[in-house]
């Protein structure tokens, strides 16, 4: 697994520096399809040391088909034009109905995933690299990987634009601060 940077939810905007805030804005722009994400893709593929292997790149389904195409169409085009060793799986997935956006759903790991997609392409025997915007709990990734494997593909790597930073419980933060204060 590779990721390009750390994602801080917008509620922490006042607690992070300008550089991190700029990264988070770029991630939002990627999610909205306003930037292509090619630099993130290239950096993560290089970090994985894929060595020009003939991987099939599949993109994580979104909450609706329009978002899916908008978010990943330029990476799909880049792969087709500039990465002859790779194939794009953009059209291997049919996002057939809308669902609530997972980041908007409260409850984190307790949420029940509603599968709003089906794999329609022939991925039998292909080595798959999954691309997504953000990893938080990994629940949707696990579900997607299982579905890919059920259809005969083998997931060999996953790349994310960002990894959500999780804060430790407030009690642990207070204990660490007070512990250092009491020792000194």
Cite the ranges covered by each PLM segment:
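Active-site-facing substrate-recognition patch
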Residues: 1-56, 94-124, 164
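Residue-level recognition of the N-termini of beta-strands and the immediately preceding loop/turn
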Residues: 54-56, 87-90, 155-157
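Short glycine-rich phosphate-binding loop at a beta-alpha junction
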Residues: 54-64
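A short acidic, glycine/proline-enriched capping/turn motif at secondary-structure boundaries
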Residues: 63-66, 97
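Loop/helix-junction capping segments adjacent to catalytic residues or to phosphate/diphosphate-binding pockets
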Residues: 65-69, 137-138
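Substrate-recognition/cap helix-loop segment adjacent to the acidic, metal-dependent catalytic center
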Residues: 68-87
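PRPP/pyrophosphate-binding module of the type I phosphoribosyltransferase fold
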Residues: 92, 100-184
């Amino acid at each position: 697994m590779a990721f390009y940077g750390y994602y801080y939810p917008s509620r922490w905007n006042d607690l992070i520096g300008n550089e991190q805030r700029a990264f988070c804005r770029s991630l939002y722009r990627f999610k909205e399809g306003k930037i292509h994400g090619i630099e993130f893709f290239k950096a993560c593929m290089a970090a994985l040391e894929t060595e020009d292997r003939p991987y099939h790149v599949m993109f994580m389904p979104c909450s609706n088909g329009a978002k899916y195409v908008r978010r990943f169409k330029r990476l799909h085009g880049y792969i087709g034009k500039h990465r002859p060793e790779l194939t794009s799986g953009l059209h291997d997935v049919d996002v057939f109905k809308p669902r609530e956006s997972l980041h908007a759903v409260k409850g984190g790991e307790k949420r029940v995933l509603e599968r709003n997609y089906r794999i329609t392409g022939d991925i039998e025997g292909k080595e798959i690299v999954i691309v997504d915007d953000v990893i938080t709990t990994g629940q949707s990734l696990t579900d997607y990987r299982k579905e890919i494997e059920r259809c005969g593909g083998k997931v060999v790597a996953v790349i994310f634009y960002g990894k959500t930073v999780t804060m430790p419980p407030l009690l642990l933060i207070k204990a660490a601060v007070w512990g250092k204060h009491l020792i000194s």
